[in-house]
Regions:
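A short, N-terminal "cap"/entry segment at the start of jelly-roll beta-barrel domains
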Residues: 1-43
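Conserved short histidine dyad/triad with adjacent acidic residue
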Residues: 42-60, 94-95
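Conserved hydrophobic/aromatic beta-strand scaffold that supports enzyme active sites
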Residues: 46-48, 65, 90
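Short, conserved beta-strand element in jelly-roll/cupin
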Residues: 51, 61-75
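Short hydrophobic/aromatic-rich beta-strand segments that constitute the beta-sheet cores
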Residues: 58, 75, 109-111
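Short acidic-glycine-tyrosine-enriched beta hairpin
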Residues: 79-95
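Ligand-binding loop in jelly-roll beta-barrel domains
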Residues: 95-115
């Protein structure tokens, strides 16, 4: 591959780990694992993210497209309907989105974020 075509081989990437900020945690003990594949200049990021079960508040300042690879999650906008996400589902969250993310079954997604 060249520097113009980048594969998604996470076995060659050291993952970052984390969790929701304590003030955003609603339930459970969710743990995040993120394999950042691309951090291009100009504020575009892509990679693979995985989370274990739990529920927390989310507030988006950025634009994100993602594709669920495995698992089951529920994203609910404040005052809106629940969006049930399973393998194969895709979603875009725009800046200003506020709500909750609940991982029911460990979920893995690939993503592209524009800040």
């Amino acid at each position: 591959m060249s520097d113009k075509a980048i594969g998604f081989d996470i076995s060659t990437i050291t993952p970052e780990t984390g969790a929701p900020a304590p003030d955003r945690l609603i339930s459970g003990n969710p743990q995040f694992t993120t394999w950042n594949i691309e951090e291009a200049g100009g504020g575009i990021y892509s990679g693979i993210w995985q989370a274990t079960p739990g529920k927390w508040r989310i507030e988006y300042d950025e634009w994100e497209y993602f594709h669920i690879l495995e698992g089951y999650s529920v994203v609910t906008e404040d005052g809106g309907d629940a969006i049930h996400l399973r393998a194969g589902d895709r979603l875009i969250l725009r800046p200003g989105f506020k709500g909750t993310w609940e991982v029911v079954e460990t979920t893995r997604k690939d993503y592209v974020v524009r800040v």
